[in-house]
Amino acid sequence: MAATRIDCDIHPAVGGTRTTLLPYLDDHWKEQVVSRAIDGLDLNSYPPNMPFSGRADWRPANGKPGSDLKMVQRGAFDQLGSSHAICNVVYGAQAVFDSYMAAGFCRAINDWTAAEWLSKDSRLSASIVLPLQAPDLAVEEIERRASDNRFVSVLVLAQGETLLGRRHYWPVWQAAAKHKLPVAIHAGSAYRTAPSSIGWPSYRYEYYLAEAQAFQAQVLSLIYEGVFGKFPDLKVVLMESGVSWLPAFMWRANKT
C-alpha cells in the first residue's frame, strides 16, 4: 500500500477583491467593494512580490504565487509527491477592523475556495477562514461550513487582536471541537500589536524570527487559560511556527 503524504499547508492566492472575490460576496459588500475601490487585501506578513513569499519556479507569468491551480497541483503533487493537500488562504479579511466586513469577506473566501479549488481536485481540502474579530460570527461561519467534509480545520492567525486562550474565544473553540475541526494557528499578523514583546522591528527578517514569540504566547495562553481542560477533545495545529524553540519552551514552562 502506498504511503499517504499530506501537505498540510498550501496557499491559494486571492487574485483581488474586485476580481476573484466579487462573485462570492453578497450584494451589500459587492457595492462596498466597487464604490470604495477595495482591491488588494494582502497581509503584509506575506508580500506577494517578496522572494521569501514564493519559490521562483512556482510563480506564474501573470498573477501572484499560488494563484494558478495547475501550477500549485504540479508543485504539491508532482514535484513534492504529496497525495493530498490542505488549502490555507491567508488574506486580509482576518485583519480588517469592521467585524461584519471581515465576516462577509471570510464567507466569500471560503465559498471561492470550495468552488475554484476543492471542486476541481478531490485531493484538495481546506481550512475554514474565520473572522475572529467577532467570535459569534466566527461560530456562524463554522456552523455554515462544517457539514462540508472538504473543510478539515479552522484557520486563525498567530498574531491577532489578543491571546487565543481568552474566554471570549471559547465559543469558537467549542464549535470547532464539536465538529472535530482542529484549530490551525498560522503564522501571520492582524497588526493590532507589535510582533515582539517590546516593540516594532525595522526589518522583515526581524519580524519573521519574532513570530516564534507569538506561537509561544498562544500555546501558553491556551494551556494556562484552561482551554484544553474545558474542551479536552480540541486539537490545535501550529502552522509555519518552527519547532526548534519548543524543547527550551517546554522545559521553562514545566520548571515554572
Spans of features found by a protein language model:
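Helix-coil boundary/capping segments in enzymes
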Residues: 1-256
